[in-house]
C-alpha cells in the first residue's frame, strides 16, 4: 500500500458521472490512388503487400490439400497433426506486420501461420542482405539453410530468405528436424526469435499474459520495439486476458514510477475478430460486447485507445498501426485494436 497516494474519502464520494469517448469503427476510407498520390506507398510496396497475402493464402491451401487429399501439386504426403488455419485473415496479418521490424515482438494467436509468415516477410524486406545471410547461416548451425540451398536455385538473398522462412515453417509443422525448432513445436508452437516471432499458443487467449510479461521486460530494460499480442474474439471470454489488459495499464506505471519511465506497457492487444470461437458465434450468441473494441472503455480512462478497423483491407490495418505505434513510443500504451476479419475454415 503506497503511502504517497492519498485516497480522499470526501472526493471519492462526490456526485458526478463517468464519461466515455466515441470509439472509432472502420473509419479508414482512402483509395489506393489517394495513398499513392500522398506518397504513403509506392507501387512496389502495394505489390509486395499483395504478394505477402498470396503467400499466406497458398500456404494454408497447401496444408488443407495435404490434410484432406494427401496431395499437393502432385506430391503425395500426409499430415496427421492439428490444423488451425487463418483462411480469410491474410490481409489482417500482413497489415499488422507491415511496419514491424525484428525489434518488435509478436506473440501468436490460435491461428498463427499467417502471422508468422507475415512478420517474417516484413523483416526480410527491411533487413540487409548481410543481416539476412548472417541470420540464416548462424541459425541451427546453418542446417536449415543447407537444406533450402539444395532446391533454391537463386542468387537473390531476399528470395533465398523467403524460401528459408517457408521451408523452416513447413518443416516445423511437419515435425522435421530441419524445422525452426527441430519439429518439436509444430503448428501450434512455431516461432522464430531472430525475426521477433515468439510462440503462438494452443490455449485460447494464452498469449495475453505472456505478451504482457514480455512488454514489462521491454519497459524495465529500455528495449526497443512494441509487443503485439495476437488473440481472437473468443479469447475475450477468458479471465487471464482481462488480467493482462489491466496489468499492462496499471495506474502505478503513471503515478509511482520515476520520471522518464512513466506510462503503460508498450503492448498492442490485437484482436482478430473472426466472429467465431470453435462452434460458437461471438456476435449475437456467446459474447455480450457486440464489438471487441468496446472493452477498452472498461479498462482505462483512455479506453485503451481502442479502435475497430477493417481487417480485410491491409491498408486500413497499416494506417491504424502507424497511429497506435506512435502512442506506444510516447509511453501511452497499452492499445486495443479490434481487427474485423472472418473465419472461412475452422479446423482440418
Give residue ranges: language-model regions:
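Nucleic-acid-processing active sites and adjacent nucleic-acid-binding tracks
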Residues: 272-275
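Conserved small/polar residues in nucleotide/adenosyl-binding loops
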Residues: 346-348
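Generic recognition of stable, solvent-exposed alpha-helical segments in well-folded globular domains
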Residues: 45-48, 54, 58, 91, ...
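N-terminal amphipathic, basic-rich helices that act as targeting or association modules
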Residues: 2-123
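Mobile "lid/hinge" segments at catalytic clefts and subdomain interfaces of large enzymes
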Residues: 342-344
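Conserved phosphate-handling catalytic cores of large alpha/beta enzymes
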Residues: 277, 284, 303-332
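Cofactor-binding active-site loop characterized by glycine-rich and histidine/acidic residues
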Residues: 65, 74-267, 277-304
Amino acid at each position: 500500500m503506497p503511502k504517497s497516494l492519498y485516497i480522499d474519502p470526501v472526493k471519492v464520494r462526490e456526485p458526478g458521472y463517468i464519461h466515455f469517448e466515441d470509439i472509432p469503427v472502420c473509419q479508414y476510407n482512402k483509395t489506393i490512388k489517394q495513398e499513392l498520390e500522398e506518397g504513403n506507398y509506392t507501387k512496389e510496396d502495394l505489390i509486395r503487400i499483395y504478394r505477402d497475402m498470396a503467400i499466406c493464402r497458398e500456404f494454408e491451401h497447401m496444408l488443407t490439400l495435404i490434410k484432406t487429399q494427401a496431395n499437393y501439386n502432385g506430391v503425395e504426403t500426409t499430415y496427421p497433426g492439428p490444423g488451425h488455419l487463418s483462411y480469410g485473415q491474410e490481409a489482417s496479418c500482413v497489415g499488422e506486420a507491415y511496419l514491424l521490424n525484428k525489434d518488435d515482438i509478436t506473440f501468436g494467436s490460435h491461428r498463427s501461420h499467417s502471422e508468422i509468415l507475415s512478420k517474417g516477410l516484413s523483416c526480410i524486406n527491411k533487413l540487409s542482405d548481410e543481416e539476412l545471410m548472417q541470420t540464416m547461416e548462424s541459425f541451427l548451425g546453418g542446417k536449415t539453410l543447407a537444406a533450402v540451398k539444395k532446391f533454391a536455385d537463386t542468387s537473390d538473398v531476399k528470395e533465398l530468405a523467403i524460401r528459408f522462412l517457408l521451408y523452416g515453417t513447413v518443416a516445423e509443422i511437419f515435425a522435421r528436424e530441419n524445422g525452426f525448432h527441430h519439429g518439436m513445436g509444430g503448428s501450434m508452437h512455431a516461432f522464430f526469435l531472430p525475426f521477433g516471432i515468439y510462440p503462438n499458443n494452443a490455449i485460447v487467449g494464452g498469449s495475453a499474459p505472456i505478451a504482457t510479461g514480455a512488454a514489462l521486460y521491454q519497459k524495465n530494460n529500455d528495449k526497443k520495439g512494441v509487443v503485439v499480442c495476437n488473440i481472437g474474439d473468443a479469447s475475450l471470454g477468458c479471465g487471464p486476458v482481462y488480467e493482462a489488459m489491466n496489468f499492462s495499464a496499471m495506474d502505478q506505471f503513471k503515478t509511482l514510477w520515476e520520471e522518464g519511465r512513466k506510462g503503460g506497457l508498450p503492448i498492442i492487444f490485437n484482436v482478430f475478430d473472426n466472429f467465431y470461437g470453435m462452434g460458437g458465434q461471438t456476435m449475437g450468441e456467446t459474447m455480450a460486447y457486440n464489438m471487441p473494441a468496446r472493452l477498452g472503455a472498461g479498462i482505462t480512462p483512455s479506453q485503451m485507445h481502442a479502435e475497430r478497423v477493417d481487417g480485410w483491407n491491409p491498408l486500413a490495418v497499416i494506417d491504424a498501426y502507424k497511429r497506435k505505434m506512435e502512442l506506444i513510443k510516447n509511453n501511452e500504451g497499452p492499445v486495443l485494436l479490434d481487427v474485423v476479419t472472418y473465419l472461412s475454415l475452422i479446423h482440418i
